[in-house]
């Protein structure tokens, strides 16, 4: 599933095609995605101008001139492409594998510029929803999300307080969207490696007895920001179904230090990268230098 860097890359790719333009026509070729599209989905989009295109965690959020918000989630295999008025596909700046099978083109936005923004999703785990901007604080998919890891509010103190007293593993805590929004398995593994912290370590060790941040929390916060920032700059990770809107493959996976590198030498200490299953997911780490 695309994580924060992939979704942010998609947002940046769609922004020049959607932001500031009117949706002349919305077409739903298939209404039963992960969740059924609302009966008034097409009507609430048609004729509205996209006044802003943002992101919250792994969700894309398009503000509409009507006061509504269009929430979009890529799911496991969802992708966007932009077909310009001249018929040439120039989907933006991002990298993520998308299906070439047009039978999976489920939703199309025909923009006033003449461009067509097409959502393709073979597995249909993605979804879209329109709701009033006034309800954004209570929207079930957004309610309770933690801070954005690249936002100004996210720092070692905030992370330490969120993890204080937690007896769960550090990796499990970071994957909890209530603790930090948008982090997924790939970048948690990479951030823990950079911070030299074991994924098995208790989350509570990020805070001292006064719930103040320990050195572990400081190192981890910096590592999270670095890993995410580098991944966004590289265009995200092209694993399985992820690609940029331009159709180009991303290349951040080539910078992975431990993820999907089981049995390879650790680039830091020369030890061996190992894999084990943690909370139903593969964890990659170096037991020698992650403590």
From Swiss-Prot:
Binds 1 zinc ion per subunit. One of its GO terms (biological process) is base-excision repair. The active site is at 2 (schiff-base intermediate with dna), 3 (proton donor), 58 (proton donor), 281 (proton donor). DNA binds at residues 104, 123, 166. Its cofactor is Zn(2+). SMART domains: Fapy_DNA_glyco, H2TH. InterPro entries: DNA_glyclase/AP_lyase_DNA-bd, DNA_glyclase_Znf_dom_DNA_BS, Formamido-pyr_DNA_Glyclase, FPG_cat, MutM-like_N-ter, Ribosomal_uS13-like_H2TH, Znf_DNA_glyclase/AP_lyase, Znf_FPG/IleRS. The keyword DNA-binding applies. It catalyses: Hydrolysis of DNA containing ring-opened 7-methylguanine residues, releasing 2,6-diamino-4-hydroxy-5-(N-methyl)formamidopyrimidine; 2'-deoxyribonucleotide-(2'-deoxyribose 5'-phosphate)-2'-deoxyribonucleotide-DNA = a 3'-end 2'-deoxyribonucleotide-(2,3-dehydro-2,3-deoxyribose 5'-phosphate)-DNA + a 5'-end 5'-phospho-2'-deoxyribonucleoside-DNA + H(+). The keyword Translocase does not apply. Signal peptide: none annotated. GO terms for molecular function: 8-oxo-7,8-dihydroguanine DNA N-glycosylase activity; class I DNA-(apurinic or apyrimidinic site) endonuclease activity; damaged DNA binding; zinc ion binding. Belongs to the FPG family. Monomer. This is Formamidopyrimidine-DNA glycosylase. It comes from Rhodopseudomonas palustris (strain ATCC BAA-98 / CGA009).
